Design a protein with these regions (language model features):
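ABC transporter nucleotide-binding domains
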Residues: 1-168
């Protein structure tokens, strides 16, 4: 939590291995994100703020692509993509290119991409920014269910009320 410019995004990108720190390291479930990058990436689902997606693909095609990059079989990735798009109320948008999505829809597809491979830890940078109130409630429920099943969510926000409502520590 912190105001814009406080270093939330920088901290998260270093902790997930997307940005190299000057010194030190980060561990995810005992795995050094710099020494064992592939193992760490399998444990992490990351949604960086402002990440450009492959917007010339449809949502389902993008999610299948991401799932396969994480080692999922194409049929498993398709099934997971279908489930995630339905859970995020994006099933109807499946035939549209991501470039035609609203900012909120794009944010939800990015969340689905972070979840596609069933990671143990989700790292979400400003996950509620540009998302409508109904979708924000839905996302909160998805994240709550995820943590109840044993997952860990690390998120950044500059909205203290969101953090207080969602976070346990």
């Amino acid at each position: 939590v912190g105001p814009n410019g406080a270093g939330k995004t920088t901290t998260l990108t270093m902790a997930t291995g997307l940005l190299t720190p000057d010194r030190g390291t980060a561990y995810v479930h005992g795995v050094d994100v710099w020494a064992r990058t592939q193992e760490a990436r399998a444990l992490l689902g990351v949604m960086p703020d402002g990440m450009r997606l492959l917007d010339r693909l449809s949502g389902p095609d993008f999610l299948v692509h991401v799932g396969m990059l994480h080692g999922l079989d194409a049929s498993v990735a398709r099934e997971r993509a279908h489930e995630l798009l339905a859970a995020l109320d994006l099933a109807e948008a499946g035939k549209k290119l991501i470039s035609d999505y609203s900012a909120g829809m794009t944010k939800k597809v990015a969340l689905a991409a972070a979840l596609i491979h069933s990671p143990r830890v989700l790292v979400l940078d400003e996950p509620f920014e540009a998302v409508d109130p109904v979708s924000a409630t839905n996302i909160r429920q998805i994240l709550t269910d995820y943590t109840r099943r044993g997952g860990t969510v690390i998120l950044s926000s500059h909205v203290m009320a969101t953090v207080q409502q969602l976070c346990t520590h």
